[in-house]
Amino acid sequence: MSMNMTNINNDLAAGKDVRIDFKQMQNFGECARRAKQSGAEITLFNIDGVQPSVLTQYTSQAPGQVTLERVFPADFGTLEIIKKGANLTCDNSKGSSLITDMVKAAKTSGAHVKFINCTRLSSFDINNLKKLGGDNVKFA
């Protein structure tokens, strides 16, 4: 079943949050424009295998309003996506040293990032990161 982009754009214009299949998407610029005007959020799914540089082109069109439905590793590619305002979930099971940079990037860009598997961070570290990132970060 293919997506009806007209219905999606109408929903966005009406302020309704939408999910869009990345592989079937057409004219994301129009979707981003309508989302920015109405405050609606866009969730992009079916993004496995899509390069971070491609995803940043989309998320930067509506910073803080585009959620990427996939768990991302805590690496430089993910940091670049966060800098462009993408909302996402980041897996820190490997104890990346980039977490502080990611938190700062989320705060600056307006992205919302949920960090999971942060077992190598102390509760003190997590509290400091929460203070640094404010409402833009969560730790689960």
Where are these regions (language model features)?
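General marker for long, soluble alpha-helical cores
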Residues: M1-A140
